[in-house]
Amino acid sequence: MFAILAISSAADLAAQTPSVPSIKALHEYADKNGVSPKDYIFKLFEKSDIVVLGERDHRDSIQYNFILDLLADSRFAERVGHVYTEVGGINLTEEVNRLLNATSTTESDFMDSLYAYYRKGECFYPLWEKYNRIKFLKGLYKINKKSSRKIHLGLTDLNFSWDSIHTVDDYKAFWKSLNKTNRDSLLCANFASMYERQLPLKGTRKALVITSQPHAISYSGYFKPWKRDYGTQGWWMKKTFGEDRVKIVVLNWFDYNLFNGQNCPMTGNGVWDAAFERMACRPFGIDLQDNPYGATNYKGDAGGGPTFIKGMKWQDVADGLIYDAPLYDHVAAIGINGIISKEFEPEIRRRTELFWRTAHPKDTIVPFDACIEEYNVPITAPATFKSKEEIKRLIQAVEAQQKAVEETIANLQNAP
């Protein structure tokens, strides 16, 4: 009788979180099958033409250490040669490449040119204040300057210019169009229009597409508020070019859309990050199909907010996973030192007012000074909204809890 109860108790413990794999299973799989993140990406390019990389929070600057390291690898220029980003209107593609390929300029002159370009506005907000964009453009310029093979940058976002926006009504008209437009499908269409004009390298066209994770995943479904189907950029990419030609890879993050201002909803209730700790945080890349990582529930949205995805696993929305840095090392960085010059301030005030009157029509006061400070003053903070020590304690608690369950199950199963 005791043996029956013991087995029953062990089964109950094991079934407490049926959708969450064990730390042990995750660790063993990644330790055995994981390869270096760069090698993983280049391995995908051997069989596929397009790799969509789902980045974390746009503010996270740490992820661009890996991205720039990938682009700096000589294999990228030789075998791929083209990188595309969600950030940046397609209409600025030629101009940004002239900037990145300037050869007879000092670093000081380049930074002046970079700031002049950036002030034009790469997107439909008054200014893109995320520091990692400057980090990326500056890094790509340095890579191109050192190499005879230049990497071409394609900008895939909507065609937009602040020069064509003169009144609140102008901006409202554009803003309303965003809700009527499947931006994800346009991100794909803009990419496709540039991709088909690429010069093949060794007979094939290859491309790395960097876009935020909610856009990168592959998902389509009916979105009630818009009364129509909605497909993510990743879904459109696979539909346009085919499953085998497109591979979607996500960077490790947390279940950001479950964040309530206080918690830190780690993926798989924290077991992914605990497994990474067992590996001494050794970076790795793995496929997601038919393994404990892929079998973990996906708890995110599609397209940056239109709809929350239910009943799907990670292997249903992405092909691969890269762990490049532990969660507690992710850093959010906003503000670009000196971007708001005295000469540029009237223009940024104009844009800010148009934006605020459109996005916050009930507000009677436009917070000009606060906005300018956000654009102009560099600030860094943990991307998880919690300190490094707090995140480590949360991961340690997950480890301790699962060890206790494993020990209890083992003791019950070994009981006479």
Where are these regions (language model features)?
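Compositional signal for N-terminal targeting/processing segments
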Residues: 14-416
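Bacterial N-terminal signal peptides
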Residues: 1-9
